[in-house]
Amino acid sequence: MWRLKIADGGNNPYLYSTNNFIGRQTWEFDPNYGTPEERDEVEQARLHFWNHRHEIKPSGDTLWRMQFIREKKFKQTIPQVKIEDDEEISYDKVTATMRRSVHLLEALLADDGHWPAENSGPSFFIQPLVMCLYITGHLNSVFPAEHRKEILRYVYSHQNKDGGWGLHMEGHSIMFGTTLSYICMRLLGEGPDGGLNGACTRARKWILDHGGAIANPSWGKVWLSILGVHEWVGCNPLPPEFWLFPSFLPMSPGKMWSYCRLVFMPMSYLYGRRFVGPITPLVLQLRKELYAQPYNDIKWKSSRHVCAKEDIYYPHPLLQDLMWDSLYILTEPLLTRWPFNKLRKKALATTMRHIHYEDENSRYITIGSVEKILCMLACWDEDPNGVCFKKHLARIPDYIWVAEDGMKMQTFGSQVWDASIGIQALLATELTHDIAPILKKGHEFIKASQVRDNPSGDFKSMYRHISKGSWTFSDQDHGWQLSDCTTIGLTCCLLLSTMPPETVGEKMDPEQLKDAVNVILSLQSENGGLAAWEPAGSSNWLEMLNPIEFIEDIVIEHEYVECTGTGMEALVLFKKLYPKHRTKEVESFLTNAARYLDNTQMPDGSWYGEWGICFTYGTYYALGGLAAIEKTYENCQSIRKAVRFLLKTQGEDGGWGESYRSCAEKIYIPLDGNRSTVVHTAWAMLGLMHSKQEERDPIPLHRAAKLLINSQMENGDFPQQDTTGAFKKNCLLHYPMYRNIYTLWALAQYRKKVLRQPTGI
């Protein structure tokens, strides 16, 4: 049976950590673990997901929850409550619902103080990892039989009814997801007509019916070329010479969004090397299966711009295609011939130096899953028996997650993010006796996860920004600063610093708090918005060069509403507790941030949320920022417009539910059937309470609270519903802890702001 291990280094000589692996999550298969009854419980969870996989696409993330509940012998002792029709919600019933939720959260807390959770969803994470390990000859050693079984379970679980796979688990079938998933099944041992319910046959039919694998988008073409089932001559150029560009040029690496820069870094190395894995009999067989015509008859040069219509979200502008054609026809032939090939050699060496730098500064985790696989492959190409490749192999378990829908690859983990919002939700409950043990552990985790140093050496020459004092999305070893994780980490530490240390532990050193403020201030743009990883400011026209057909706004760093809102909340609290630190800069930050929120509000009163779905999410965080600087419904038109938006989108059942299609279409779209989700309902409630809706008309809040209370399950959990996380306009991420954290937070604020505490309590 599968078991989750926390903060475990496994005595691997190729692993090292900056804080003794705090926050690390790894899964192991133990054939002797679990009783027959416990194993049957796991099988029942798998069967339940399978039977409902086309209704609720994301997993409930139940396997580790079952494990923790068993290990801690948790039993929900507080009776479940329900609100009947026409019944007035009482203070006691809300309190009981909250306490039930808190008790479950305590059982789910890991020993190091964080809540483990899945953070996945795209169909281009685990599949390329399988391809990489197949190429390097490590597939069976890294993924033994039980691992391969669970990866196949995951692939089968998310196959659409038409036989294809989407860009993410909720999406319509596309060539990219379908080709990668088909290849993944074949590399894991399924025959061309194998797989559960004819999975391979159905997938291959979808591929051939839609033009064959030649119609893959650019990333698909690259991965197929790496495997040897596509030719590099059929790809648009990815010249590593880009890494030689001086910083004053508008198209230099330092001008790019960090993720884009670091994905195309190893990709350009592999392109420059024209790297191709071993041409095995299976690879030769795949060449026959993936195309509608014989492989050797394909006109690769003319296929570079071919892409299935199902995959296109961001069509290439004509200017971009002209640029690729110029590089392809004029530049590449020169760079592969003497004497210009000396420049190519220098570029490859420079690119590899950057790869090693990023690997070392992230303890071989790298910034995320897409880059991780490519960097690992580049290190193998450099030296298959080298230490760098072995260090990469040692960090693969950090990315692997197992749930009832199988084994998948994480983005890299949401440990710090989930812990920080979870602590804030608990603090809002004011259930001091119930939450004290959780607060102490959570406080220690957040303190231990703060990044203590900047990247090594002359980090600016490596296009890196300051990170000292920041928090990452996952753990300290990851090393990559993130503005909203820093703002909520700072907020948690500030709030906990005002509480008795015997209850919540020793407060953080004020100098470390100030370091966090320095990072936040450094990431604000001239327009007042807060960027995510690095300062924004590159020219927007560079987005015309986005080569990725299925996502948008990836070339340069941008500002984000939710980062800005949490930044305002954090700095208002910091200013109150430390009024003398960079006073003018903090005041200026708040003024400019408010201006940014005013300027980015949509005509309907909402704000677009980049990292959650979508307008409900963005509006909640924007209202939090405005409320922090004492903007009110009475004195702020933006708040009045936002309230009208939220009230207008409330459903008949009292809740809110927003479709993921809002992200791509950039207009509010309710869920099919006007369904509500507990997470969207919680976000909307919190947003309305930021505006003091309870003082104007509490009825919308009563209706929403009733839905949340009645949705709570027998053990204190809430149901897993539609996916609520998103990124880059057209892709989704699954955050299963949201259903526990935001529901608790909303009910806590509802009890405090809307209901009156009975006399004597």
From Swiss-Prot:
Residues in PFTB repeats: 148-189, 513-555, 590-630, 639-680
Q: Which NCBIfam families match?
A: squalene_cyclas
Q: What is its EC number?
A: 5.4.99.46
| Protein known as | Shionone synthase
Q: Which UniProt keywords apply?
A: Isomerase, Repeat
Q: Which domain of life is it from?
A: Eukaryota
Q: In which tissues is it expressed?
A: Expressed in stems, leaves and flowers. Lower expression in roots, stolons, rhizomes and radical leaves.
Spell out the molecular function terms from Gene Ontology: beta-amyrin synthase activity; oxidosqualene cyclase activity
Instruction: Name its GO BP terms in alphabetical order.
Output: triterpenoid biosynthetic process
Its GO CC terms are:
lipid droplet
Q: What class of enzyme is it?
A: isomerase
Q: Name one Pfam family in it.
A: SQHop_cyclase_C
